[in-house]
């Protein structure tokens, strides 16, 4: 087994070891670990850090055209985009976004405060259902929206996404699995980064995987299952 198979790079990103963006994110990570939703089934620490990780990858992709400040604004938005999320399907994601914005306003650092409006605009792009088509957004809003909708492509997606959302939505695992084919089939990436990260063959492979889970879950056991 290789070191890369067991060692994550989140500390590398938070410290900004590669000097990709302005400053570092260590202060915000410490705050994030104290958020009310770090242990939620889906809208948890793993999700918020996964979106941050993806936004870092996008920053690397666009490093020749984005400034270090623009990258930092995106990463701060990613960290806070689900801050204090209640973890329940309430049908009012605008209220969940407001919780995130309140957390940002309360904890934003002095050096980031002049860019509060830009960071807030990026966070607001993650409100679902979407009020504005992704193609009509600015590049930073497009990136965070694509990152936020792409955790299905991680290897731990069944536990994190399927089981996590089933718990938060008070649905069965099969209910959520049945949603995956239409969701993934309608997933469209508009940024060059997103298109390279998740080409259509990758999306198709994930659809087939979700279909496989659905087929197994819909089978009926013919013999009693030992307890």
Mark where each language-model region is.
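Eukaryote-skewed repeat-based solenoidal scaffolds used as protein-protein interaction platforms
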Residues: 13-17, 72, 116-117, 121-124
């Amino acid at each position: 087994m290789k070191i890369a198979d067991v060692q994550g790079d989140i500390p590398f990103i938070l410290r900004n070891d590669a000097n990709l963006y302005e400053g570092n994110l260590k202060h915000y990570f410490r705050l994030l670990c104290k958020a009310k939703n770090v242990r939620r089934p889906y809208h948890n620490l793993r999700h918020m850090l996964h979106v941050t990780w993806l936004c870092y990858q996008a920053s690397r992709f666009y490093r020749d055209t984005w400034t270090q400040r623009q990258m930092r604004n995106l990463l701060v938005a990613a960290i806070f985009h689900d801050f204090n999320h209640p973890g329940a399907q309430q049908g009012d994601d605008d209220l969940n976004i407001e919780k995130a914005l309140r957390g940002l306003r309360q904890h934003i650092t002095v050096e980031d405060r002049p860019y509060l409006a830009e960071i807030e605009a990026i966070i607001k792009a993650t409100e679902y259902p979407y009020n504005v088509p992704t193609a009509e957004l600015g590049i930073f809003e497009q990136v965070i929206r694509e990152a936020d909708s792409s955790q299905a492509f991680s290897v731990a997606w069944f536990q994190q996404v399927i089981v996590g959302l089933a718990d938060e939505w008070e649905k069965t695992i099969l209910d959520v699995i049945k949603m995956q084919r239409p969701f993934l089939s309608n997933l469209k990436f508009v940024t060059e980064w997103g298109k390279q990260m998740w080409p259509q063959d990758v999306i198709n492979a994930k659809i087939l995987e979700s279909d496989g889970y659905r087929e197994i879950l819909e089978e009926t056991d013919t013999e009693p299952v030992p307890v």
